[in-house]
């Protein structure tokens, strides 16, 4: 018969073996769980990306508009996409505002800068510096800056809204929260069917005319971008609503429009707790949309 001490030692060895085996099994189980979670997360990211791009493909179709149903689609409780489409024509096209240095357009720009908190001196300085930034010569505007020791404007058209921050004396504007949201470089003109109250005021339109025009344009629900909107297609009729006579309309020709085809489209795809977003600026109006910006 085996001595008790040897039996105890054997039992301890068995217990240690069981403990080690249990630890190994537990570690393996945790590794498997982590691997499953990792692959699950990867799958979520793939699904969210697929939803996002599916939504964008739908939005870019020539027949799809802001009023089209199905722009917010759920395929499962945690799987789907949401599309937002906003007219880029409701913003101020900075390139058109400074093109040709037309006094009436520069006046609109200066009014906007005033609303952004810039005083007279800051407005005059920034506008002249902006003109020096984009013109094709080294002749300085009255309040502008051309070649200096540590500043050389490129003397070419703007390439992006962000580039405005490189213009001399742009600091006061850059410190104004959300200023970039008011500007665009992609529209074909200021779309009066998309412009809000603040933008319409920049054209020198009085408040009663703005109120009446927006009530008509927005329809019974008082909201832009809904099926009951009444978008006007005749510039003379719009001019009458806004109190703009023929002379004033002619002075704004080439800057205002009634149907800008440029849209900023944001498609957000979701899968579980993962979301993916694509932002596109596109000009629609034919079978193949013109992509002006694609950002993921």
Label each region the model flagged.
Residues 2, 9-296:
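Compositionally biased linear targeting/interaction segments
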């Amino acid at each position: 018969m085996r001595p008790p001490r040897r039996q105890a030692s054997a039992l301890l060895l068995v217990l240690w073996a069981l403990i080690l085996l249990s630890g190994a099994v537990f570690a393996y189980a945790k590794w498997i769980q982590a691997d499953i979670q990792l692959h699950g997360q990867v799958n979520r990211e793939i699904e969210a990306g697929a939803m996002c791009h599916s939504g964008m493909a739908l939005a870019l179709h020539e027949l799809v508009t802001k009023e089209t149903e199905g722009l917010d689609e759920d395929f499962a409780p945690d799987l789907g996409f949401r599309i937002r489409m906003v007219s880029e024509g409701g913003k101020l096209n900075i390139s058109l505002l400074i093109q040709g240095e037309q006094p009436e357009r520069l006046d609109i720009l200066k009014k906007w800068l005033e609303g952004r908190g810039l005083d007279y001196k800051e407005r005059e300085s920034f506008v002249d510096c902006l003109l020096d930034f984009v013109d094709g010569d080294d002749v300085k505007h009255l309040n502008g800056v051309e070649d200096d020791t540590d500043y050389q404007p490129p003397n070419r058209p703007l390439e992006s809204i962000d580039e405005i921050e490189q213009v001399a004396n742009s600091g006061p504007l850059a410190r104004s929260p959300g200023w970039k949201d008011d500007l665009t470089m992609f529209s074909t003109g200021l779309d009066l069917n998309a412009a809000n109250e603040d933008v319409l005021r920049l054209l020198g339109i009085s408040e009663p005319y703005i109120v009446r025009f927006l009530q008509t344009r927005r329809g019974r629900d008082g909201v832009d971008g809904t099926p009951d909107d009444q978008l006007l297609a005749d510039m003379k009729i719009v001019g009458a609503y806004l109190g703009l006579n023929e002379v004033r309309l002619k002075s704004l020709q080439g800057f205002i429009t009634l149907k800008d085809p440029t849209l900023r489209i944001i498609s957000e795809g979701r899968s579980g707790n993962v979301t993916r977003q694509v932002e596109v600026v596109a000009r629609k109006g034919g079978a193949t949309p013109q992509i002006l910006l694609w950002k993921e």
